[in-house]
């Protein structure tokens, strides 16, 4: 039998039908045809998925663990997604719950370029404090207005300032003009204050456009970027990460909702595997419906030991406010990037002061958090 990865699914089925359902998933995620039509022993033994375990988790609810051949992956990130959950994602009774990959497969994809420790080093942050981030909004502002927002945020002492994930190469703020203006504003503040604030442009487009955008950023002294893996595609995301080993990448979760991959596996493992140095996800109690347990599981998957890969920093976000900072630090400890966007921008003329209050609140609360990193 060839090397195998393990994939665990949550399946809605009756006790009478679950065994057949599990075997059906094993076939669908491997050879996708009747086994009776296969006459090659190597395919039957080495490629066909194997049902290893079925565990009942409630009425008409089961966990199914499959062993799938790593040979079917071919070293490609998109094909990894395909063989883990491609056709089965079309079955609305099934969720991809977890993955367990052999060390050689982990090493072949490589994970983050610099990881959690590298991000801390970039902004001069010690290991005992959480990091801070905000976003440039709204869509529609011209480059000079976005640069002014970034300047005032940087004066407040933020670690990271990212583009809103919807910013691309629109006519009202073309990528090159926006990045040049914002990078210059942040760099000027850093030189004045001795700070190390990083600006993260949002990357978009096809592979050649992404390459060009990263190079544009590098030309402006930028070394950290925002990217949406499910928009550009897993293979493209992975290719960009590997092509620019000195760059760091925050992965945005947009469009990940329809995938029905459990968030800890999706953001904490798959995004980390393909190269996310930080993973943004919807925090509990915000605009989205994730539970506190789910959010903690995402953070644990992003930070935990995994075959020698760098840890990814969790970035809980989505409608957060300054009032929630103590709670977030108590939940995640210092091993987190706290992202607050619109709530800061509501300060308008007091943006710098409100940003400074955010930074001070995170610094003051971090020492009281429990932390999730091993």
Swiss-Prot record:
This is 5-methylthioribulose-1-phosphate isomerase. Belongs to the RuBisCO large chain family. Type IV subfamily. One of its GO terms (molecular function) is magnesium ion binding. The keyword Oxidoreductase does not apply. Coiled coil: none annotated. Catalyzes the conversion of 5-methylthio-D-ribulose 1-phosphate (MTRu-1P) to a 3:1 mixture of 1-methylthioxylulose 5-phosphate (MTXu-5P) and 1-methylthioribulose 5-phosphate (MTRu-5P). Involved in the MTA-isoprenoid shunt of the methionine salvage pathway. It holds the Pfam family RuBisCO_large. Its EC number is 5.3.3.23. GO terms for biological process: 1-deoxy-D-xylulose 5-phosphate biosynthetic process; carbon fixation; L-methionine salvage from methylthioadenosine. Disruption phenotype: Disruption of the gene abolishes the ability to utilize 5'-methylthioadenosine (MTA) as a sole sulfur source. Mutant cannot release methanethiol upon MTA feeding and accumulates MTRu-1P. Inactivation of the gene increases ethylene production from MTA-grown cells. It comes from Rhodospirillum rubrum (strain ATCC 11170 / ATH 1.1.1 / DSM 467 / LMG 4362 / NCIMB 8255 / S1). SUPFAM superfamilies: RuBisCo, C-terminal domain, RuBisCO, large subunit, small (N-terminal) domain. It comes from the Bacteria.
